[in-house]
Amino acid sequence: MLERLNFIENKYEELSNKISDPSVMANQKEWQKLCKEHADLEIIVNTYREYKKAQEDLESDKEMLKEESDKELREMAQEEIKELTLKLEDLERELTILLLPKDPNDDKDVFIEIRAGAGGEEAALFASNLLRMYTRYAERKNWKVETMSLNATDIGGFKEVTVAIKGKGAYSRLKYESGVHRVQRVPDTESSGRIHTSTATVAVLPEVDDVDININANDLRIDVYRASGHGGQCVNTTDSAVRITHLPTGLVVTCQDEKSQLKNKEKAMKVLKARLFEAAEAERAASIAEDRKSQVGTGDRSERIRTYNYPQGRITDHRIGLTLYKLETFLDGDIDEVIEALVTEDQAEKMKDLGRVN
């Protein structure tokens, strides 16, 4: 590990020199790429330097303990040695985590697709609850939320809705939300007070650049039609809504949120690229580790990941067996406690994998 950390520190110094070079700064695209690489290494280098300083201090205290005869000074040195030993253990764990393979999509913006599952109108209302939860979470993070497409019901639910969430680290936090979310509650329309179970499916897709995926224009069928609102009524007198079908895969994306046909097409293409990228990534991951299923979950949208129980005020994440009794604040976007637990479990799984490889 130390050999790798020394290499990273040297690389960081090289990048520091490059990004301050006027000739490199003249090429803005290359300069921004180097700045990002420099920023990605900074936390590792700073932690490593703190680790080396603690090691030096520890050796110094050990030397002093050998030579010092004063009782009080020896006691101080022994106490410092204990503290520094614990600090080094913590820093070593932190460095191990920092050196884990990073998901290349972690820094990307995301699309979140929410679809009502089993449960009819109640499932559609739950889909709207989930949309609000992610919107409130994004607000807490100062991320931007943009509606891409929606299919609303007459009573305020969503058969399906897609939003873009833009902000630093959006995918790294939200990627754990892919899967089936289950709600248990008494619907407003239920006169007998029986608890119903409904579901909604969430898919979290990283937004991809043109360089990440290439789409042949001949593989697309693009249809335009008039946008409709709640209950199907027409809300636009022009054919501004867009439906794009990717013929080789059968994937269909619609967008009618904008008044401009061109803007709707641009939005739909972004979502289509994200879906195709996700499909390619899933196929690649399956070929690399066909039988491996992380305890954190596969990210498969068919996997049941969480239950929201209203009568008990309970949320249970089934992937890690975590139960919290804070349903109201959770649905108001206070979801970091669960996400942190999922991140920790994911890191533990990756460390196990590294141990098996090594």
Swiss-Prot record:
Belongs to the prokaryotic/mitochondrial release factor family. One of its GO terms (cellular component) is cytoplasm. The modification N5-methylglutamine is found at Q233. Keywords: Cytoplasm, Methylation, Protein biosynthesis. InterPro entries: PCRF (IPR005139), Pep_chain_release_fac_I (IPR000352), Pep_chain_release_fac_I_sf (IPR045853), Prokaryotic/Mito_RF (IPR050057), RF-1 (IPR004373). The gene is prfA. The keyword Acetylation does not apply. Its main location: cytoplasm. It is found in: Cytoplasm. It holds the Pfam family RF-1. This is Peptide chain release factor 1. GO terms for molecular function: translation release factor activity, codon specific. It comes from the Bacteria. The keyword Protein biosynthesis applies. Peptide chain release factor 1 directs the termination of translation in response to the peptide chain termination codons UAG and UAA. Methylated by PrmC. Methylation increases the termination efficiency of RF1.
